[in-house]
Every structure is written in structure tokens, then in C-alpha cells.
């Protein structure tokens, strides 16, 4: 179901909606480019978001990009736990709406 081979089909998106696809890819590249925040940290943030949205493609892409940017397994592990803490914290704080 979730084969990375599916990402090869993204080229069809560019053919069917070239202007929007070009704008999206330019935005994506600019957002993740080296800047005030180093690329490694941007990729770790992207990995946390991917874990939160539970997109298997995004997880794999940003895991590899984080490694390529110099992230260690220990850094990725801490990123996993930060993500888990925030997801759990959101459930707890949203639970306050249930209390009278």
C-alpha cells in the first residue's frame, strides 16, 4: 500500500498542474533550505511533523534527509520522543474540555 515507488508518480502531478506543482516544489525547497535554522534541524522538525501527521512517505523522506544533513540516530530518537510528548500533551490538554 505504502511503497516509496508511489512517489515516482509525482511527476504526473507536474504534468497535470504544472504551475501549481512548480510553485509547491519551489516553496518546499525554500522552506527546507539552509538558513537561520541549519538544514539538519529543519529536517528533524520535518521528521517530527511527519511523525505527527503519520505520513509514511514523509517519514521516510525526512528521515533520510535528516541523516544526509548529519542527524544522528540519537538526535532522531529524541525527536521521536518530543513528538510523542507533544501528541500526548495535546490529548491531555484537550481532555480538559470534557471536565465540568
Protein language model regions, located:
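Short cysteine clusters
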Residues: 55-58
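Amphipathic, hydrophobic secondary-structure cores in small proteins
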Residues: 62-70
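Acidic, glycine/proline-rich low-complexity segments that act as flexible tails and inter-domain linkers
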Residues: 1-43, 67-68, 94-100
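Generic low-complexity, intrinsically disordered sequence content enriched
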Residues: 14-17, 48-51, 85, 90, ...
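C-terminal structural segments of small proteins and small subunits
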Residues: 72-100
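Immediate flanking context of iron-sulfur cluster ligation sites
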Residues: 36-53, 73-80
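Membrane-helix exit/interface motif
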Residues: 31, 60-63
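Basic side chains
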Residues: 40-42, 62-63, 87
Amino acid at each position: 500500500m505504502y511503497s516509496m515507488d508511489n512517489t515516482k508518480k509525482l511527476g504526473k502531478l507536474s504534468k497535470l498542474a504544472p504551475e501549481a506543482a512548480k510553485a509547491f516544489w519551489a516553496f518546499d525547497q525554500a522552506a527546507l533550505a539552509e538558513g537561520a535554522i541549519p538544514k539538519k534541524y529543519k529536517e528533524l522538525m520535518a521528521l517530527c511533523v511527519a511523525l505527527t501527521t503519520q505520513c509514511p512517505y514523509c517519514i521516510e523522506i525526512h528521515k533520510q534527509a535528516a541523516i544526509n544533513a548529519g542527524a544522528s540516530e540519537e538526535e532522531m530518537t529524541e525527536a521521536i520522543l518530543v513528538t510523542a510528548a507533544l501528541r500526548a500533551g495535546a490529548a491531555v490538554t484537550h481532555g480538559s474540555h470534557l471536565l465540568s
